[in-house]
């Protein structure tokens, strides 16, 4: 579920243009990201989008994630992202009992995914040719790294049945004619074509 959360969060960052621009003006960062999202949406509707880069900085992205404009799946709270060259690190507090609701497993390896945990996820992410790509490098629960094969079991059991396009490696269409997305130091740069 952490993988799903990271994937979802990464998609939010890269796909910020897909979000609606609400009137919640609780911070300058949120107001700024809402203006940029509105620009991306409007630019994406034109016959020839302006290819000038749109840069979303980390403070804007995190203000957006903390706002009521993003609805995370049940059990996922306090999401925060940090960007570096080509990589994203995400943190969240996750109640796995809520995340796994309705799906049970007798596999003892999956028992670590129960209760409330602080989750850290590191991933590589980029967009090219209108497609977004995410590869989850590692997931830790309360500072303890989850072995990759256990993470894969979790994804197969709890993520893929509900979200078949999300996994350790994910590929998805970028919205609003976004052609490329580059994660940089504390920012993501989006170019439309």
Regions found by a protein language model. Name each.
Residues 1-7:
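Positively charged n-region of N-terminal signal peptides that target proteins for export
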Residues 7-17:
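Bacterial N-terminal signal peptides
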Residues 2, 18-20:
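A broad helix-preferring feature
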Residues 20-193:
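Extracellular/lumenal and peripheral-membrane lipid-interaction modules
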């Amino acid at each position: 579920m952490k993988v799903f959360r990271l994937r979802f969060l990464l998609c939010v960052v890269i796909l910020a243009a897909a979000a609606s621009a609400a009137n919640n003006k609780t911070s300058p960062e949120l107001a700024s990201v809402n203006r940029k999202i509105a620009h991306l949406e409007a630019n994406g509707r034109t016959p020839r989008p302006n290819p000038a880069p749109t840069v979303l900085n980390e403070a804007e992205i995190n203000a957006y994630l903390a706002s009521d404009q993003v609805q995370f799946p049940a059990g996922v709270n306090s999401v925060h992202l940090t960007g570096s060259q080509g990589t994203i690190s995400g943190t969240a507090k996750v109640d796995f009992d809520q995340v796994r609701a309705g799906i049970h497993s007798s596999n003892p390896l999956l028992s670590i995914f129960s209760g409330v945990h602080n989750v850290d996820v590191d991933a590589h992410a980029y967009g090219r040719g209108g497609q977004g790509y995410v590869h989850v490098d590692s997931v830790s629960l309360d500072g303890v790294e989850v072995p990759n094969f256990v993470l894969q079991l979790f994804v197969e059991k709890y993520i893929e049945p509900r979200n078949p396009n999300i996994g350790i490696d994910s590929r998805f269409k970028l919205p609003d004619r976004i052609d490329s997305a580059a994660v940089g130091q504390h920012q993501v740069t989006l170019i439309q074509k």
